[in-house]
A protein has these predicted regions:
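Transmembrane beta-strands of outer-membrane beta-barrel pores
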Residues: 8-10, 23-29, 104-106, 113-119, ...
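Residues that define the transmembrane beta-barrel architecture of outer-membrane proteins
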Residues: 1, 92-96, 155-159, 197-203, ...
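Outer-membrane beta-barrel "beta-signal"
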Residues: 2, 323-373
């Protein structure tokens, strides 16, 4: 990785101004999403990928596939994940970023541009050598709406900016960040290739304030920090058919709010805090209280917990009824929405529930004791 910085300092207009450049030419490494049983594996994606790869390599059974009545045994090379296309280690796959930041009359700002490879995978149903298991011949061809995938890591372009400013009248710091991307890919059960591209607008509004809470501590202020994260899928597609929803499982517009309240006691050696987060569309929340106690210069004890509450898992069209092999899997054409009558938690329902909603049964209690030599 190479970085460069040009510090212009104070100018006629700005109190401070500088520019940064980043060129990441390292070998591409995707995010590690964990394996089955791995703690904190987001949305349990690793288990799903492993199961789907096994389906392609060795065959598997899928319940309620053909017409929603019977389970179906698939031989190898019909459904699942066929291949993973990691970007080559080349200059054309490098990642570039540019940032202009400065200060104007007490307002900090930044403008950012970045082109990069998504470290989260996209599943594209573009397999061209699948076989129809209901015929004796080996067709080795592509089929629309078939849950057979290749995994890709698309290139994403991002532009964004941020503002930081202090409001003295209310003793608060505010942060506003926004970013617009193109090139991101999302699951889409209304498309023959089962994915689509969408521009995405994301934003964050943050507020920090030291606040005295006399009945808790008359001598030391608490830190109160709140943030609101927003996401808008510009090219969102969704339809409701036969009582279930199909298309993009991600919410078109969603918000996640967080709140931190942190205090200090005994000359800052004891610090309790509580963190809360709420996913508005998933109707899911997490509450995480903890206390940190510096017993001595060498010994520290941290006790914490997190408790999740909410509606739990949500269902979404999983394309089991997408009719990829007519007339064996149903009447009509492949992808006929009139046939859509099956939805499930796995895998696309997870995108509706989000990380908090899918962790409703994962309350935790933690004790950490550290000794420093």
């Amino acid at each position: 990785m190479a970085t460069g910085e040009y510090r212009m300092g104070a100018t006629e207009t700005f109190d401070d101004l500088n520019m940064q450049f980043v060129w990441n030419f390292d070998k591409f490494r995707p995010n590690s999403l964990g394996q089955g049983g791995t703690p904190y594996a987001i949305l349990d994606a690793g288990s799903f990928f492993r199961a789907m790869k096994n389906c392609w390599d060795n065959g598997c059974s899928v319940s309620n596939f053909a017409g929603g009545a019977l389970s179906t045994d698939f031989p190898k090379h019909v459904i699942g994940i066929r291949d993973v296309h990691l970007p080559d280690w080349s200059l054309s796959n490098s990642q570039f970023g540019l940032k202009l930041e400065g200060d104007y009359q007490g307002v900090g700002f930044s403008l950012n541009a970045l082109t990069y490879r998504s470290q989260l995978p996209s599943l594209r149903a573009v397999v061209d050598n699948a076989d129809n298991p209901f015929t004796p011949e080996i067709e080795s061809q592509s089929y629309d709406y078939l849950i057979a995938f290749d995994m890709y890591f698309p290139r994403v372009n991002l532009i964004g900016g941020s503002l930081d400013f202090y409001v003295d009248d209310i003793k608060s710091v505010f942060r506003v960040e926004a970013a617009y991307t193109d090139g991101e890919e999302f699951a889409n059960t209304l498309r023959p290739e089962l994915y689509s591209e969408s521009d995405v607008f994301r934003y964050v509004i943050g507020w920090d304030r030291p606040t005295f809470i006399p009945f808790l501590n008359e001598k030391r202020a608490f830190l109160i920090s709140a943030q609101l994260f927003g996401e808008y899928l510009v090219d969102h597609e969704r339809e409701t058919v036969n009582g279930i929803e199909a298309g993009n499982p991600n919410w078109e517009i969603n918000h996640v709010g967080t709140l931190l309240v942190k205090g200090w006691y005994q000359n800052d050696r004891v610090s309790p805090q509580v963190i809360m987060a709420h996913d508005f569309k998933a109707h899911a929340s997490v509450i995480a209280p903890s206390i940190d106690w510096l017993i001595s210069d060498n010994l520290r004890l941290t006790v914490g917990a997190n408790v999740k509450v909410g509606d739990g898992e949500q269902e979404f069209d999983d394309c089991r009824a997408c009719n990829p092999f007519p007339p064996f899997t149903g009447d009509g054409e492949p992808g006929d929405t009139a046939l859509r009558n099956l939805a499930g938690y796995e895998p696309l329902g997870r995108f509706r529930s989000g990380p908090i909603g899918m962790a409703q049964a994962e309350d935790e209690f933690q004790i950490t004791l550290r000794y420093r030599f």
